[in-house]
Amino acid sequence: AADETGEPVLTMDSLVFREVSADRLGAAAGAGGDDGSLFRVEWAELPVPAVGSEPVASWVALAGAEDVAAGAVDAPDLAVLEAYGDGTGDGDEVLALTARVLGVVQAWLVAPAFENGKLVVVTRGAMPATGDADVTDPAGAAVWGLVRAAQAENPDRIVLVDLDPAGSAGAGPVLGPVLATGEPLAAVRGTALSAPRLVRAAAVETERAAAAAADVAAESRTKTESAYAFAPGGTVLVTGGTGSLGTLVARHLVAEHGARHVLLVSRRGLEAEGARELVAELGELGAESVVVTACDVADRAAVAELVGSVSAQHPLTGVVHTAGVLDDGVIGALTPERLAYVFGPKVAAVGHLDELTRDMDLSVFAVFSSASGLIGSAGQGNYAAANAYLDAVAHRRRAAGLPGVSMAWGLWEQSAGLTAHLGAVDQARMSRGGILPIAPAEGMGLFDAALRGSAALVVPIKLDLRRLRADAAAGRGLPGLVGGLVQGGRRQVRAVDGQAGAGESGGGLAARLAGLTAQEQEALLLDFVRGHVAVVLGHAGMAKVGAETAFKDAGFDSLTSVELRNRLRGATGLKLAATVVFDYPNPLALARHLHREVIPDGVTAGPDVDVDEARLRRGLASLPLARFRAAGLLDALVRLVELDDHEPPIGTVDDADDETAIADLNVDDLVQLALGDK
């Protein structure tokens, strides 16, 4: 084969084909095609609004949870929490900082004085806002993950700002411009503001094209294929190696990448279910040695012993970290202990692996992270924080010239590892958010594509862009991070989708109710609530939602309760407490509460209220008869009066008789008359 100049670029003696499954073909197409599922994060510069960017006159500084009560005395509109780590990224420091931030956020969210205010959480150097720049504060990155979950649970209340690590000024000068952008996530570098956006990851072919333009095409062909190669003579360490994802990766490395020496680490080692069968299977696939060992990867001494146990004959050349645990809970339910539990196999483990392998000749250092740390996942604050830290470690390694990539995965199919616990309600919530499950074969295709790339952070996530576009077109909210993928959806707006009046403002709902009787108002609000309940629970319609069925009996938990509260708040504009589902425990009780809030004076309309009729009569009486004649209504009015059973025929009428007849009509008659209904 030759290039465009006629120079030979390839000599081939033979070519061997092998069968490729349809799943793998689909995975390859998904990774590199126009509808691919591999993304990266780009920081897009924001225009500074001309209006509203003035310096903020006053705010209250919150350093700890105890400051919330003291700061509430003046009922300020704005509170600022500065959360700076020491830059070491030590696991203890990460836990201490995120626990402090958690305490402040929890106290602020429940403080009545701050109910209508905003909280700005400020970090410094926690985000790589200038591309693949270094992250100087990994602990601050964990704070971003935690607070993103808090934002998902409490829309429009919290803002995250990352200050320039090269600067020393506090947050004060930038509060006005940042808040004026309306962005929930922002970074300040010099005088520029930017916000994160998901963009499609560059395919390997794009890298090669750029290299060819620079006359280094031949070098790129070697570089892109070998930079991530798992050397057959080296050992690959896979943490979480007997779990669903670790097993999937181990099979893939041996079968597709030619790895011959594999070290699988898990909490139970060979005692884990299926571990011995996995060893035999990997041997059949071509592995020469497979070691399965139990190790607490959160323990530095244990990790040091593990790394030191690898033979010099087959040195450690690759690390793939898939280990992790879940302990989901809304922000208000989290504790420092629950943070620590999830941080162990994520924050501590990756920190130890990073430190203890820096002097080794690794070709791959890949960590399985989660998109929850980027997009924000309600009910997963601790998990999001841990994974955001992993992303920061990958950035630090790349900045130091070391291999490192964090893969912030979206939703795996239910049978895979950490998503196996998801029920129908959870899956329905993900689907409404435009996130689809990734099949195992497709996931491994994305894994390979991530390794071929040059980004420190990639996001393998299967997005339903058609649904996201429809949501954007309908004015429904999209997180700013994914809004850039959809035309017209770059900014997050408050709105909801669903049934029974979803998406209307509080004023629109009040206007609909104002024309109804009290009984009709309650019926409309009941259907309104039942419709939103049906959406949250994943029902096709509201038929399965009983008016007096307790929310807890219908399957509500703390997370679905928060989601329902947010949907109702977005649709009504009301300030609803996070406990509203517990305070009003069934759809009927909640509908009656909304009735009192939307129509506080109990104003109704209909036959029992004649204030509107009186106003209409006065208006009709003020109209000259010529107006009715010109509109062609006079004859109809006369005929209507002549057919009234309560009045004798009036024969010929003069103007005075006409006015009297019209004045005797009720509202229903007048409406029918105006519509031409005789």
Where are these regions (language model features)?
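4′-phosphopantetheine-dependent carrier domains
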Residues: A1-P184, R189-L193, A210-A473, G477, ...
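Short loop/beta submotifs within extracellular cysteine-rich repeat domains
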Residues: V262, P479-G484, G488
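C-terminal catalytic ATP-binding subdomain
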Residues: P196-R197
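Disordered, acidic interdomain junction associated with two-component signaling
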Residues: R200-A209, K223-A227, L485-G489
